[in-house]
């Protein structure tokens, strides 16, 4: 009987040693606390951010729209739905036309369209400049969004569907649409 109790105590002791608690360290040099278990809601290594193009910038916030269309018409929703988010707390160097990935604050997102969130981190996704091009992609997008065609379309939330550069004609073609629109504007931007 004594052997069974000792064996049971050893098993309990071994099992309790297997449990782990987060290891917390305090760095006295910078007064910060870190944990061996990252915050999966805030750590961008564990969460994809919202990827899209910056299409508007006003009042210290930017509107980012995603070019991938979703069809929710089978459930009574939009046939041409494009995700869009207004972000506050964005660095001042973020400009219209840039392709970005934005990580939002946990729980700050709203359900309205476009959504609203506070940016925790923003990364500009660099696109290579095509051989022979004078402009970079973000400059061509900025010119397209400022064009009279886009102004005439009166898009509240423009979406950059696609960007192409034609080296033989030395021009960019920017395809622009918006939520609920099947129609896509084809904006030509001279490479100057």
Predicted regions and their residues:
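A short, surface-exposed beta-strand/turn
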Residues: 179-192
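Positively charged n-region of N-terminal signal peptides that target proteins for export
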Residues: 1-7
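Short, non-transmembrane alpha-helical segments in secretory-pathway proteins
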Residues: 36-42, 50, 127-160
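Short aromatic-glycine-enriched beta-strand elements
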Residues: 59-67
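Flexible glycine-rich surface loops and low-complexity tracts that mediate binding to linear polymers
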Residues: 92-113
